Amino acid sequence: RQRTEKIGFLFSFPVTTISEYIARLITGVVIAAEQESYNLVLYPLKDDPLEQLTRICRAREVDGLLLLARAQIDPAISLLEKESVPFVLVGRRFEQPHISFITPDFVDGARQVTRHLLALGHRRIAYTTRPALGITSRDRLEGYRQTLAEAGIPFDPQLVVETTTQPNSSYQAMNRLLDLPNPPTAVFAIHDLVALECLQAAADRHCRVPDDVAIVGFDDWSMSLTTQPPLTTVRTPLYEMGRQATHTLLNHVTEPDLPAVQTILPVELVVRQSTAGSSPV
């Protein structure tokens, strides 16, 4: 089979909400691809991703694919395996040992957040989950639950609230938490954008952050430096993830029989004023 000297990057997010995430990742991908004289083709996933994927595979448009997809990925994986197209999952892990992936350590990120809040004296720590994100959301929930259990704090399902990508979903979730008879003193948001709405909800209720409620995000988007107050968050190595994913993919392209490479990259808690020095009353 003749090589195209191109790799594809498939992503299934609305481009508007995820632009910074994609941009950082793609920078790493492009630089690694250029080192190997490869070009990059971007494929925003359409309404019928399997049909789109089938066309890409059959037309042999690219030599391999990077898949940035969060949930419902199994049919795509089956198709790529059937078509013998090399691929690497980016930004999530996968349970099967023969699938290559690279992901931030979501479990440890959640553990670092929860440990930080516990060290400040918080005991009622809420978590805003997003079931549509699949395993990446469950991994964070797992890290949060593990760390509470290690501290001897019983898990309270009332403190886990679901959010969606709908506008104001996270704002409403924060209000539900603050309306509880015994509200949380700290909130761990699944993403910085979610944390932004939580900050707004707190401000609208004249709740002081971090004095009345501490708030933590995830991903360390640039806006987290300029929120009021600046946001404690978890920095994920997006550039490095893109770079390593590309090298792994190109190794699979040149040597199809190589075993799968499963990489979990460390993440870093970045402490700012949204938690700094806060302690529950």
Regions found by a protein language model. Give the residues of each.
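N-terminal helix-turn-helix DNA-binding module of bacterial transcription factors
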Residues: 1-5, 279-281
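Short loop/turn motifs at secondary-structure junctions
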Residues: 3, 61, 121, 156, ...
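Alpha-helical recognition/docking segments in bacterial nutrient-uptake
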Residues: 5-115, 119, 179
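Hinge/beta->alpha junction and helix N-cap segments in small-molecule ligand-binding domains
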Residues: 12-24, 42-51, 102-112, 128-173, ...
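Periplasmic-binding protein-like
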Residues: 62-68, 126-128, 160, 181-191, ...
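Flexible loop/turn connectors
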Residues: 171-281
